Each structure stands twice: as structure tokens, then as C-alpha cells.
């Protein structure tokens, strides 16, 4: 079970493609190595488009339309929360839930089925909540998984620049807060994962170092 961490605009998709063979443009949920990709952003962007919302307009919506922003991002369940299959079968996505909340529920169901089959997973997230990662790591290990983390690092300035070119543009203040939270967790993650922790400097897009790929 591999945890990806790095703030918005850090280039996690590029790194996952380089290391694990995941093409972010593909609709499939697996890598060329057979690892299943768990990423609520894919479902989120799909649901945004189904609701007639251009992901590139999120930053503008956050500033200009508080009601719509709430419908998009109101409190959502945590994707990594361990859920048993029996519970998942009874779960239904309520019509009143936010788009982000619905995306996370879809992804949580997907993740639980992968876990039931003990399939290898790449859990793609920002890592801005240390307690969430620690909890999910412990749970994955209780299921028999070995756990690893790839931390994709970049400067705030580069992250902000890339954010403007992403399909889903985040508000500047949210991006900066997330970036700072992730940076504050860097040392904690190193201690948590020990020898199974790798940092990828992605300030400039370039081939991933061989020692990271071999790890």
C-alpha cells in the first residue's frame, strides 16, 4: 500500500506516471504494475462536469458564489476511513450531499473493495492531515499490507504557477494552506514510515531518480 503525499500543484500525477505507470488521462483505475489507484479527485472532477461545473472555475466560484461553493465542498467523509463491506452495501449517496462528499463516498467504497481483495493500492492524497495518514497506515498494516510513502515536494511558487494550468484550479488561499500543512508534516511522515519513505523533488519535471524507482 503506497501513500502519495504532496500539496496541490506538486505534480503527484506526473510522479505516479513516472514511477508506477499511471496515466492520469486514462479512465482505468490501475497502474501498469497492477496497483489500484485510489484518488477521490477523479470522481470529484467527473461529478463537477456532470453537474455543469467547469473545474477551472472553482477559484472564481469560491470568491463569487458562496451558495454554490457550499454545495460543491460542504463537509465530506474522509476517504481513508476504514469501512466494512457490509456497511458499504447499505450506504447510499444522499441527494443533499455536496459534490465533494459524494466523490469521497464513491472512492471510499472503491477502496474498501480493493482492501477486501487485498489488492495493491496507491492512495493519492495531499497528506495535509497527519492523523489521517497515520490511522490509514495502521489499518492497512492490520490487513497485512506493507506500507510506503512517496512525498512529492515542490516550492510554493511553483505549486501556485502549476495550479493555474491544472484542469481543476483551486483558490490561492486554499492551495497555500494545504501546501503549508503538508510541509509541516514532512518530518512526521519520515518518522512514521522510516525506511519506507522517499522524497521526490518535483520543482522541475524530470525523470525520477533510479533509487526512488527501485525502492
Region spans (language model):
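The conserved Walker
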Residues: 7-8
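Conserved glycine(s) of the Walker
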Residues: 11
Amino acid at each position: 500500500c503506497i501513500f502519495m503525499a504532496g500539496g496541490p500543484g506538486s505534480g503527484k500525477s506526473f510522479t505516479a506516471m513516472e514511477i508506477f505507470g499511471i496515466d492520469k488521462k486514462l479512465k482505468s483505475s490501475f497502474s501498469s504494475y497492477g496497483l489500484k489507484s485510489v484518488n477521490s479527485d477523479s470522481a470529484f472532477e467527473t461529478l463537477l462536469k456532470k453537474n455543469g461545473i467547469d473545474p477551472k472555475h472553482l477559484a472564481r466560484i469560491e470568491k463569487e458564489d458562496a451558495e454554490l461553493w457550499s454545495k460543491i465542498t460542504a463537509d465530506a467523509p474522509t476517504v481513508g476511513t476504514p469501512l466494512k463491506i457490509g456497511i458499504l452495501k447499505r450506504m447510499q449517496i444522499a441527494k443533499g450531499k455536496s459534490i465533494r462528499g459524494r466523490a469521497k463516498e464513491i472512492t471510499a467504497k472503491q477502496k474498501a473493495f480493493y482492501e477486501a481483495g487485498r489488492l495493491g493500492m496507491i492512495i493519492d492524497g495531499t497528506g495535509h492531515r497527519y492523523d489521517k495518514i497515520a490511522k490509514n497506515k495502521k489499518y492497512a498494516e492490520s490487513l497485512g499490507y506493507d506500507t510506503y510513502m512517496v512525498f512529492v515536494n515542490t516550492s510554493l511558487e511553483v505549486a501556485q504557477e502549476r495550479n493555474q494550468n491544472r484542469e481543476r484550479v483551486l483558490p490561492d488561499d486554499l492551495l497555500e494552506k494545504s501546501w503549508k500543512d503538508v510541509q509541516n508534516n514532512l518530518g512526521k511522515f519520515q518518522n512514521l514510515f522510516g525506511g519506507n519513505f522517499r522524497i521526490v523533488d518535483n520543482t522541475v519535471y524530470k525523470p525520477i531518480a533510479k533509487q526512488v524507482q527501485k525502492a
